[in-house]
Amino acid sequence: AWNGMAISSLVSAFRATRNPKYLEVAQEAANVLLLKLWLPDKLVHSDISTQEGFLDDYAYVEKALLDLYDVDKNPRWLEKARDFNALVLQRFLEQDSGKFLYAARAASSASSSSSGSTQALASAKTYATTDGTWPGAAGVAIENLIRLDALPKVARDGTTGPDYLAIARRSLAASGRAMQEDPVAHASMLVALERLLRVRTSFGQN
């Protein structure tokens, strides 16, 4: 998660100052991250472990890739963001409830103690809906869905993605009562909801 946050911060610095050095460092960091932490079928939590990352690792890196694509239009970032999103939906989205889990449903079966912790989190159905010292992973993941819906839909292999907005709406609805009862703890979810409402308003004006 920290790597994704750092890359997004560098992109924000570039937007504010137009200093190309910030963008260059962000691009380099993203390339290193994809080289070191991205395995063929998962994002690992660190470069010294094969433990799969948690939802915040995926969501924040996906956000960083979308932020990079917004400023440099490199299609590689968008393709990788789609790859990350596909795994988020496959491994972290609980189909029955529409909520996002903090640990992947198909947790690693490795016998390390860290892997056991991951499996315990998955079996306990720890949801990622509330904010802590940074925005909650579910809110970021939902906002990523809404952003992806506004971008080119056809992937490199000619396929189109899922109905991103429908998934976002369902996930927000699943936490609707919690957002009403404790909006401060669900600020990132409310930010995602506000973005979704802006999308619906713009459709209505077309």
Residue ranges of predicted features:
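Glycan-recognition and catalytic cores of secretory/periplasmic carbohydrate-active enzymes
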Residues: 1-206
